[in-house]
UniProtKB/Swiss-Prot annotation:
Protein name: Fumarate reductase (cytochrome)
Residues reported to bind fumarate: G195, T402, E403, H529, R569, G572
Binding annotation for heme c 3: H83, C93, C96, H97, Y386
Gene label: fccA
Main location, first listed in the record: periplasm
Subcellular location: Periplasm
Residue numbers binding succinate: G195, H390, T402, E403, H529, R569, G572
Complexes and interactors: Monomer.
Keyword Signal annotated: yes
Superkingdom per UniProt: Bacteria
Family of this protein: In the C-terminal section; belongs to the FAD-dependent oxidoreductase 2 family. FRD/SDH subfamily.
Gene Ontology CC terms: periplasmic space
Length: 596
């Protein structure tokens, strides 16, 4: 097939789209392409779609236009490049581009940039809920009356950090696994995590002479969660956190940098060298290892109903593919790793009315499907009222700014140019403090020394959300901050750094003075970030009912579960949670399958 330069293609699209009556007038990409290609240029010879992941169709896109990396070279923008994706895995062309209907830019589900994609419409997530899908009685009954489409040992629902960890762990324990994902991209919320992976008494800490222990991590986690956490689950998290770091490292992860996150007594947030975002890196490593193991990954496929026999034992799961429709998979065990519900503001607001209308830092699939599936299977929910806001979501562009920026030395100031909080306090306290300021927002202020300490910051600068100036007065004028007061505030902060003690707000770490090179400001406001409540599990990741009885063959891991974090999650504990309990769920599900 002749390879078409994408820059030429886009120029043609932009120059002709909407000019009805011309040779290339079209309402969608299929109409545009058919004037230069035949239908079988995209589709299989029989005219059918290859699968729900659209594997063949995406291969055809690449054969014509090139890989995502190649396309990115021809679509550069001053601040952002939609094709230079920060997503891990192999991002499919059809994640954004549709053929026979209007396309939607997946980036718009989180960001507020103008990507101006040809033949596109405004982003809209309008999928039926699990309850609404129950109305598809005839289709569901027909699928269940048929023979199982597949027979495996374990089905994992959700391809975030917990799901991939579970799938790999189960596979390595001898199980045959199918991993399903309802979104067109992998990674869940894990791919967006930037701060670090908390773990205690690791080799990486020892190399930096950091004294830590599982007991101290346990204490910090319980305190951060207001002692509402399930102590047994927290003990699993803290005592196995080192093993999780070792497991990821053995698979190729770089977790050599160790920083501090809010609520931690010592530096225990592990991340790549130079302070790069941990989430996308971890998910990429997990994805690569899943590919090596030939794990069956099915995109655009929703887990709909856990199927049980007359004794209440799991026998499989009903799924719905975007194109294949309903079918069921026979399996001894099902692992729910579907994440939380922070993107579902209707659900969030019912549980915490104070968060009504808040935007969220989460990926669009985090609406609570797994909770509904678990409840319908008899699983109990706990701690649902505890919902966390992340304090630093950029007002411009909707970018979540990692806590590590504060951990590495940035300060928070209000429009009056004054500090108002210990910058690395727990997220609930920092969020409340920001909302109490003028305009319900604040500014992260830092210099080039902080920027150089954390490579993730260059991404924010590149996205245009971190204006810069060579003086604090100029920066203040640019951002509407009192420049004189800001200058005095930074001078005061630098004096506290020199003294080694923050007598103003009792910030426990003062890593560096802010006096090198240029200064930067990011306006931030809290956004709904993490839902601490979820499915009740035991220390084997087994889902339990309201009587705390195990549902045989049903497991849960990650943000879909409740009990680990209590009333408030500490930064850095999410990645540790999903890897630790994902591994555990996979191992236990594989063991269970062998016995049954």
């Amino acid at each position: 097939m002749k390879k078409m330069n994408l820059a030429v293609c886009i120029a043609t699209l932009m120059g002709t789209a909407g000019l009805m009556g011309t040779a290339v007038a079209a309402d969608n990409l299929a109409e545009f392409h058919v004037q230069n290609q035949e239908c079988d240029s995209c589709h299989t010879p029989d005219g059918e779609l290859s699968n729900d992941s659209l594997t063949y169709e995406n291969t055809q896109c690449v054969s014509c236009h090139g890989t995502l990396a190649e396309v990115a070279e021809t679509t550069k923008h001053e601040h952002y490049n939609a094709h230079a994706s920060h997503f891990p895995g192999e991002v499919a062309c059809t994640s954004c581009h549709s053929a026979h209907e209007k396309s939607m830019v997946y980036c718009d589900s989180c960001h507020s940039f103008d990507f101006n994609m040809p033949y596109a419409k405004k982003w809209l997530r309008d999928e039926p809920t699990i309850a609404e899908l129950a109305k598809d009685k005839s289709e569901r009954q027909a699928a269940l009356a048929s023979a199982p489409h597949d027979t495996v040992d374990v089905v994992v629902v959700g391809s975030g950090g917990a799901g991939f960890s579970a799938a790999i762990s189960a596979t390595d324990s001898g199980a045959k696994v199918i991993l399903i994902e309802k979104e067109p991209v992998i990674g869940g919320n894990a791919k967006l995590a930037a701060g670090g992976m908390n773990a205690a008494w690791t080799d990486q800490q020892k190399a930096k002479k950091i004294t830590d222990s599982p007991e101290l991590m346990f204490e910090d986690t319980m305190k951060g969660g207001q002692n509402i956490n399930d102590p047994a689950l927290v003990k699993v998290l803290s005592s196995h956190s080192k093993d999780s770091v070792d497991w990821m490292t053995a698979m190729g992860a770089d977790l050599t940098d160790v920083g501090m996150m809010g609520g931690a007594s010592v530096n225990r947030a592990h991340r790549p060298t130079g302070g790069a975002g941990v989430g996308a890196h971890v998910v990429q490593v997990l994805y690569d290892n899943a590919v090596k193991r030939n794990i069956d990954l099915r995109m655009n496929t929703r887990g709909i109903e856990v199927l049980k026999d007359d004794k209440g034992t799991v026998k499989g799961i009903l799924v719905k593919g975007m194109y294949k429709g309903y079918y069921w998979v026979k399996a001894d065990a099902v692992i729910l790793a579907t994440g939380g519900f922070a993107k579902n503001n209707e659900r969030v607001a019912k549980l915490d009315p104070s968060l009504k209308g808040f935007i969220s830092t989460n990926q669009p699939g985090a609406v609570g499907d797994g909770l509904d599936v678990a409840e319908n299977a008899g699983g109990a929910l706990k701690d649902m009222q505890y919902i966390q806001a992340h304090p630093t979501l950029s007002v411009k562009g909707g970018v979540m700014v990692t806590e590590a920026v504060r951990g590495n030395g940035a300060i928070l100031v209000n429009r009056e140019g004054k500090r108002f909080v210990n910058e690395i306090t727990t997220r609930d306290k920092a969020s409340a403090a920001i909302l109490a300021q003028t305009g319900k927002s604040a500014y992260l202020i830092f210099d080039d020394s902080v920027r150089k300490s954390l490579s993730k910051i260059d991404k924010y600068i590149g996205l245009g959300v971190a204006p810069t100036a060579d003086s604090l007065v100029k920066l203040g004028k640019m951002e509407g901050i009192d420049g004189k007061a800001l200058t005095e505030t930074v001078a005061r902060y630098n004096s506290l750094v020199s003294s080694g003690k923050d007598t103003d707000f009792e910030r426990p770490n003062l890593p560096r003075a802010l006096n090198e090179g240029n200064y930067y400001a990011i306006e931030v406001t809290p956004g709904v970030h993490h839902t601490m409540g979820g499915v009740m599990i035991d220390t084997k990741a087994e889902v339990m009912n309201a009587k705390k009885q195990v549902i045989p063959g049903l497991y849960g891991a990650g943000e879909v579960t409740g009990g680990v974090h209590g009333a408030n999650r500490l930064g850095g504990n999410a990645i540790s949670d999903i890897i630790t309990f994902g591994r555990l769920a996979g191992e236990e599900a594989a063991k269970y399958s062998k016995k049954n």
